Amino acid sequence: TLNDGVKRLQPGDSAVFAVVYQAVRNGETLLKVDPEKEYAGRINRVQSIMEHLTLVTPDTILNTAFEFAKLRVGESIYKTKNGLINSPGGLRYYAAIWANDQAEYTGPYFGYAGYGPGTEAATNAYDWFSGYMNNDFRPIPSSVIAEGTSFWNGAGDRGDQAMIAYGASRFALANGNRETAGKLWPLIEWCLEYCKRQINLDGVVDSDSDELEGRFPAGTANLCTSSLYYDALVSASHLCRASGRPPEVTRSYEIQASQIKEAINRYFGAKVEGFETYRYFRENDILRAWICIPLTVGIYERKAGTIDALFSPRLWTADGIATEAGDKTFWDRSTLYALRGVFAAGETDKALKHLSRYSERRLLGEHVPYPVEAYPEGDQRHLSAESGLYCRVFVEGLFGLRPTGFRSFTVSPQLPSGWNTMELKNIRAFG
């Protein structure tokens, strides 16, 4: 404690003291800390995160929740011996990356955010994964840990290559930097080829598990992996065109995307618990949260039944969408994907109603004022990637922003019927 001791204050006086926490390696000495300088540095960092990507709506709870989420994902960046990296944090996960959290969830967000350390962290994450590409097409590990020096792959192939290709291609387009995109392309290309080699006789992608790593059944081929692969092919075709790659390469990805989309509807499309939606895997006969994911990648053929199922009492709870109908477990990531997908599908008022309920519970409830990881596992850790997903509900869902090139995008704003205006300002994307 600096400037500690007994202070006698008269009315109007003040006293300042600082509590300092430091961790140093064995043999190193503690740093001399200037609390005022550290405080000023913190304020400057927060301002640099908050000055871009500003949401303005008639709903102050949504505006505030967006700002909190933006801060949470932007501040969870750490200096490692292999560069800046975004990690989940939450008092648990540091100096490490995951194919879902960093490659799939936060990477695309940082493409829009205009926050320099975030852009650097996303680029570094994809670079860490690229170090595990190989000529035999063995799967890239699910997680790179220990400051980029080791890995974890305890759940086998979770569909990680689809996650990486999806996120890296979206980030490359939104970031708008041709040189960075060129560096990412070998990783994207490799991951797409890996997924292609995993396509089974039914035309969908096999994997050992999914991002829940066996906590719930996922079969030998799940809806998430094939949907992410489809979206990655769509983005890759845009990236090829923007980068000036041969037209036949672009066309090949477009054909593959069309084929996997058809296979998704054919193989996974089913009536589950009375709803015309999707089965998560072949043997699945219980509604699952991840039936939402086709909506987030522009597959709308079964949107009516899917949206009805998502917001039915079988899946929707006070904390968002249950992982499986009838179970108390929830993971915020699937709720945030669902809300984004319902906005994208054009059911704006339904999406807003449930987004408002969710946002009020997270911002003003009894826990941290951010999206969380899960319950009961981890007791709702405030991991940073979920905050990135929350922001993407607005950027890609409510405002319908989709990169199609380094300087081009499609946009389809979904203005709720009760609002007269909404704004997403200070977007720093596309170079």
Regions found by a protein language model. Give the residues of each.
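Helix-capping and short linker residues that terminate individual alpha-solenoid repeat units
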Residues: 130, 134, 176, 196, ...
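Gly/Pro-rich turn-and-neighbor structural signature
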Residues: 55-68, 250-272
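Substrate-binding groove/exosite segments of carbohydrate-active enzymes
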Residues: 47-182, 209, 283-296, 310, ...
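Proline-centered turn/helix-capping motifs that create local helix->coil transitions or kinks
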Residues: 77-80, 133-138, 196-206, 266-273, ...
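Active-site core of glycosidic bond-cleaving carbohydrate-active enzymes
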Residues: 98-127, 182, 186-193, 214, ...
